[in-house]
Amino acid sequence: SKYFETVDFWIENLLDSTESYTIESNEKGKFVDITINVTKDDMGKVIGKNGRIITALRVLMSSVAKKDRKSVKIEVKEM
């Protein structure tokens, strides 16, 4: 989905290696759940200082989803 691709693009550009993360996307009706599984070493890069990076990504995805009348939830987990 375009939500998965957008998140993947940003995470890929934040991190040095595509092997240090995986992304799972689950779309049910108007709800989209995205889970970013990331290594412990790269967790800080994805979350950012005071959560700024992940917050910005969530705001961006909410804006994209709003025009499709969808709701996107992004979770970050350690792998």
Enumerate the language-model features and the residues they cover.
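RNA-contacting regions in translation and RNA-metabolism proteins
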Residues: 1-45, 59-79
